[in-house]
Amino acid sequence: MRASLPILIAIGVMLSIAMGLRQSLGLFLQPLTRDLAMAVADFTIAIAVQNVAWGLLQPVAGALVNRWGFRPLLVGGAASYVAGLIVLALAQGTAGVVIGAGVLIGMALACTASAMALAVASRAVPSGMRSSVLGMVTAAGSLGSVIAAPLGQYLADSAGWRAGVMGFAILGALMLPAAWLAGRVDRVALPVRSDGQPDITARTALASAFRNRSFVLMAAAYFVCGMQLIFLATHLPSYLAICGMDPMLSAEALAVIAAFNVVGSLFFGWAGGRWSKQLLLGMLYTARSIVLAAYFAFPPTPAGTLVFAACMGFLWLGVGPLISGSVVEMFGLRWQAMIQGIAFMSHQVGSFVGALGGGVLFDLLGSYDLAWKIGVATGLAAGLLQMMFAAPRPPPLGPPCSESPRLDPALSAR
C-alpha cells in the first residue's frame, strides 16, 4: 500500500481538479450568454456536446489503456482540458464555446475523470481494500469544487467571466504533473491467472457485459443518474438567479455539494464493501429523487438551498465506487476501464439529455418546472428497478486469479 500512496494522491488531485472545474462551469452561464448574446440553450448545447464526447470516448480510452498504458492518456487529457478552457475564455460566439467547453473538455474528461481515475485506483490496491479506496478517491474528486466554485464566482464578479475561465485554466494546469505521477500505475502488473490460460479478449469481455442482465440494468439506471446531476450542475445557478438569489449562493451551494460529497463518497465506498452494491445504488437513486422533489416543490431560500446542497452532495458521486466495484466484481481488472466506460457512456447520454433538455424546456416554457419533474419521475423509476433486480455478487469473469498488485520488473524503468 505504501508504494501505491503517491499514485493514489496524484490521481486524487487530478480527479479533484477535473471534476471541480467541470461542475463549476454552470457559474458562467448567465454572464457568458449575456455577453455573447447567446440563448441559454446555446450554452447547454456546449455542455451537452461535452458530455456526449466524454461518454463516447470513455470506452475508447479504457480500451487504449491496455495498449498504451495509463500515463499517455492521463497527460494528454490534462493538456486537452487546459486547451479547452483557454479556447472558452477567448470565445467570441457559440462556435468557440462549443469547441472549448464541449469538444476539448469532453475529450479531456474521458482521460482524466472518474472512470479512468477509479480504474487507476483499482489497479493500484489489493482487492480487500478496493471498495474503501475507491470511495476515498471519489471523495477527493469532489474537493476541487470547494476551491473552483468560489474562485470562479469571485473572478467573474470582480473581473468578468473570461477572467474566471482563465483562472480555471491556470488551476487546470496543475493536472499535468499529477497525471504524470499517477501514470506510475503502469508499473503495477495485472493479476496473474491461476490456470495459465490466456486472458480474455476485448470482444469476449464486451459480449459478456451485454449478456449480463445486472450490468445492463445498472448501465440503464446510470443514464438517469447523469441526467439528474448535469441538470443540477448546469441549471441550478441559472434557476437561483431567476429566483432573485444572490449570485454567490450558487457558488456556495456547489461548494457545499462538493464538501458533503466527500462524506457520501467515503460512506458508499465503505458500505459497498459490506452490502450489495446494486441495492445501494437503487437506494441512492431513490433518495436523490426524493430530495430533488422536496427542494423544487417550494420557492428557494438561502437556507433551504444550502440544506438541499448538503443532502444532494451526500448522494452526489457515491455511485462512483459502487459502479466501479460492481464492474470489477463482475468482470475483473483487465478490461475494467473499457467496460466501466460502456456504463459511463450511458451516464453521459443522460447528461446530454439533462443539460440540453433543461435548457430547451426553459426556453420553451420559461421555467424549470417540467424539467425537474421529469428528473424526479425517472429517478424514482430507476431506483426502484435497481433495487428490485439487484443481484448477489457474481464471481469475476474467468478463473480465479491473484488480486494483489505487484510491480512488473519489465515496467520498472517507466
Residue ranges and their predicted role:
Residues 56-95:
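Conserved MFS/SLC helix-loop-helix module at the cytosolic interface between two early adjacent transmembrane helices
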Residues 96-112, 304-318:
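Hydrophobic core of transmembrane alpha-helices in multi-pass small-molecule transporters
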Residues 101-139:
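Cytoplasmic helix-loop-helix junction between adjacent transmembrane helices
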Residues 32, 111-125, 318-331:
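Intracellular juxtamembrane helix-capping segments at the cytosolic ends
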Residues 257-261, 267, 275-326:
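C-terminal transmembrane helical hairpin of 12-TM major facilitator-type secondary transporters
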Residues 137-187:
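Helix-loop-helix hairpin linking two adjacent transmembrane segments in secondary transporters
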Residues 57-70, 265-277, 363:
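Helix-to-loop junctions at the C-terminal end of transmembrane segments
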